[in-house]
């Protein structure tokens, strides 16, 4: 029970009833009145439309040029084969896409387990799923199957619509339904905590394609909802401009006096005679210009170069907008 009348009850996961391998009922209670429908509807929409998953997006079948054709010795036409492939539950690990191959000959059904794949990165959840039937002993079928990771429903036309794109003959594109959740409904019942009887109990009935467990699906959906709501937690006045810290136009060391370099008296006097008072003035001079300075020889030039190098500076540096206003004012 909450400690204050203004505090909200926090629901807890009461029960997970596993009905089948792919279907489960998840119960949460207690919820404040009305929150059963609020959370139930939000989770339902996310689970149906926003969950990432895997789908077959492209297929190439040897001897087949387009989806409206048939293949001799195969009971199903190409359209039916593609529909059967769309129902295949498959999961890939560590990759966003993978291309699989299937080869089968001889009379009998062609099932998902006939697909050649790396068991370390690919898992076929429904290995006995029928893709087609071979009716002639001399017939064989070979196909290339591309599986991709995505979210929601993506029609083939949106993945291949540019006028500059040329679809290779024989490559068949499928509309991709990535969502691993096949069916979901929720029900809100009355719940009770001590003397309160106006609370909600949320029961979510969900069925997946087997690539994800119902409990994990709800956890991911709740995470997505939480991340989307984070923007509302720290609202700012959109009319109030953000104060950005102004970066100095010049490196502060360039604004320091040449005296800070601790040059020999001879070198320092030569620079002052040429009105070189700031380090920024000095680094813009070239070696040739400094050698033209009266009484400044190669030894003094070497000293100046070494001192500047120790501070990450060098002669002949070009500085835009030099000198700055504050130096001119001084």
Swiss-Prot record:
Annotated family: Belongs to the RNA polymerase alpha chain family.
Record-given protein name: DNA-directed RNA polymerase subunit alpha
Keyword Transcription on entry: yes
GO BP terms: DNA-templated transcription
Region (Alpha N-terminal domain (alpha-NTD)): 1-236
Catalytic reaction annotation: RNA(n) + a ribonucleoside 5'-triphosphate = RNA(n+1) + diphosphate
Cellular component per GO, a single term: cytoplasm
């Amino acid at each position: 029970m909450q400690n204050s009348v203004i505090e909200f009850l926090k629901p807890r996961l009461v029960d997970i009833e596993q009905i089948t391998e792919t279907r489960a009922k998840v119960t949460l209670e207690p919820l404040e009145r009305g929150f059963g429908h609020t959370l139930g509807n939000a989770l339902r929409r996310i689970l149906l439309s926003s969950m990432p998953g895997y789908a077959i997006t492209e297929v190439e079948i040897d001897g087949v040029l387009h989806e409206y054709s048939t293949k001799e010795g195969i009971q199903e036409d190409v359209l039916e084969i593609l529909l059967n492939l769309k129902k295949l539950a498959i999961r890939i690990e560590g990759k966003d896409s993978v291309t699989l191959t299937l080869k089968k000959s001889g009379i009998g059904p062609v099932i998902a387990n006939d697909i050649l794949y790396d068991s370390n990165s690919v898992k076929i959840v429904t290995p006995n799923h029928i893709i087609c039937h071979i009716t002639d002993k001399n017939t064989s079928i070979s196909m290339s199957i591309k599986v991709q990771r995505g979210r929601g429903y993506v029609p083939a036309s949106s993945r291949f619509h540019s006028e500059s794109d040329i679809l290779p003959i024989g490559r068949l594109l499928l509309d991709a339904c990535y969502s691993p959740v096949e069916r979901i409904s929720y029900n809100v019942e009355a719940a009770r905590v001590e003397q309160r009887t106006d609370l909600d109990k949320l029961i979510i009935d969900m069925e997946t394609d087997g690539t994800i467990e119902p409990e994990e699906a709800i956890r991911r959906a709740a995470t997505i909802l939480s991340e989307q709501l984070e923007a509302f937690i720290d609202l700012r006045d959109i009319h109030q401009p953000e104060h950005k810290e102004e970066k100095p136009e010049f490196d502060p060391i360039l604004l320091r006096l040449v005296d800070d370099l601790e040059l020999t008296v001879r070198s320092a006097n030569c620079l002052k005679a040429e009105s070189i008072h700031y380090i920024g003035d000095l680094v813009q001079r070239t070696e040739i210009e400094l050698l033209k300075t009266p009484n400044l020889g190669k030894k003094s030039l070497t000293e100046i170069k070494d001192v500047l190098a120790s501070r990450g500076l060098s002669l002949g540096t070009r500085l835009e907008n030099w000198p700055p206003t504050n130096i001119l004012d001084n």
